[in-house]
Amino acid sequence: MAEWLHWRASRRVFPKAEPAPDGGAEAVVVLGFPIKRNGGVHPLQRWRCRIAARSMDSRRDGVMVFTGGAIKRDQPEAEAMARYARDVLGVPKDRIRIETAAGSTWQNIEFSIPLIEHATRIAIASDPMHAARARRYLRLQRPDLAARLAPAADYRFLEAWWLKVPTATHELAAIARRNAGRVIRGLIPRAVSDR
């Protein structure tokens, strides 16, 4: 079930228009996740970095924007992931940008916008269900930038299968919370909700 949910999410929340032609600038936004207690890079962070690295188009000028603050640890998530991408995956330092203030997925997108506005092609690197939520947030915050969204290479059959169940559970809970909020807002009389 989790495998199917991630596969489906990897194909959702993209513009209907044709993708940007070859060439032009590219930005891959890599969403944060807390580092391990010992300061090491979490397996979910490593997965997101691998997704980002394989999503970069070698025919384009581009950057990877690592986003995430120091949420549960002293070190910002973005710095740990950027270091892993540079030192382990071989991402050139000049292609790395770091945003260290974000404390949520909404803020990951919001605070990355100044670093991706120049791009003609934008991809979001995370587990597929989380990336779909982030694409929806970009569409809400900046529809003009969401029109430049392109798929990341985020879904591979059975890749990181041990992470797909908990990430799918987390995203399904987020969807349930969002839907519950809509129901509750619908139950509040208009005069009360406008105050």
Q: Where are each of the predicted segments found?
A:
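C-terminal capping/extension of enzyme domains
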Residues: 158-195
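A structural signal for short, hydrophobic/glycine-enriched beta-strand patches
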Residues: 7-169
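Transmembrane alpha-helices and immediately adjacent membrane-cytoplasm interface residues
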Residues: 1-3
